[in-house]
Regions:
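Hydrophobic residues within well-ordered alpha-helices
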Residues: 5, 27-28, 78, 117-118, ...
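Short helix-initiation/N-cap motifs at beta->coil->alpha
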Residues: 14-25, 70, 90, 105-115, ...
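A ligand-binding cleft/hinge motif common to bilobed small-molecule-binding domains
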Residues: 39-48, 94-97, 118, 123-153
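Flexible hinge/capping segments at coil-to-helix
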Residues: 52, 66-83
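Periplasmic-binding protein-like
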Residues: 57-64, 129, 133-177, 193-200
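Short helix-loop capping/hinge motifs at secondary-structure junctions, enriched
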Residues: 66-74, 105, 164-170
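Ligand-binding clefts/hinges and TM-proximal coupling segments of bilobed small-molecule sensing domains
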Residues: 90-105, 143-148, 176-200
């Protein structure tokens, strides 16, 4: 998607890889023009950044050990569990808000969180559902729990843009709409689901 936006703008794409919790800071300080990292357009973030039209309606799930499927069937069973989530993300804030008695382990890398789950250091990892399904599909000892927390409405993933840059937002919106309309974005999703295991 970033390449398609760069092509539309007629500029060379420069991608900076960083931990999720540094992404929005880099945008805010002017080190980046756009942030595309599975960022939910929350009301809190909208006060600081502009956002494109949504490109993905996110679903968030708990990845657990398959042997614990019967153990974690409702929110009460997760109330005092040790839950890992990626630092600075909506899944992390959902655990803080909806499971305040749970022991939260905030990590910068999803692969690390899954390793902690498999080694028994945490009981569950709260993450984007497509990523959770991919991990479960490739690791016979893992499964996606049937219980989930409540997503707030309107918190779809969108491209974050520095506040007030309406010209850039207009171009980004146009590109996203085109990618969704012509089926290219669906192809991106399919490729992404195959790549989620690379970091593990």
């Amino acid at each position: 998607m970033a390449q398609a936006i760069a092509d539309e703008l007629g500029v060379k794409l420069e991608v900076s890889s960083m931990s999720f919790d540094n992404v929005l800071t880099s945008l805010q300080t002017g080190k980046a023009d756009l942030a595309i990292a599975g960022i939910s357009a929350t009301e809190e973030r909208k006060e600081v950044f502009d956002f494109s039209i949504p490109y993905y309606e996110n679903k968030i799930s708990f990845l657990i050990r398959k042997s614990d499927l019967e153990k974690y069937k409702d929110l009460d069973s997760l109330a005092s569990a040790n839950i890992a989530a990626q630092k600075g993300t909506v899944p992390e804030s959902m655990v803080k808000e909806q499971l305040p008695k749970a022991q939260l382990t905030s990590l910068t890398n999803m692969g690390e969180a899954v390793n902690e789950l498999q080694s028994g250091k945490v009981d569950a990892v709260h993450m984007d559902e497509p990523v959770a399904l991919s991990y479960a599909g490739k690791n016979s000892d893992l499964a996606v729990a049937t219980v989930s927390l409540t997503m707030k409405e309107g918190e779809a993933n969108a491209v974050a843009i520095k506040k007030g840059n309406s010209d850039l937002k207009e171009v980004v919106d146009k590109v996203i709409q085109k990618l969704k309309d012509d089926g290219t974005y669906q192809t991106y999703l399919e490729k992404a689901s195959k790549l989620t295991e690379v970091e593990q």
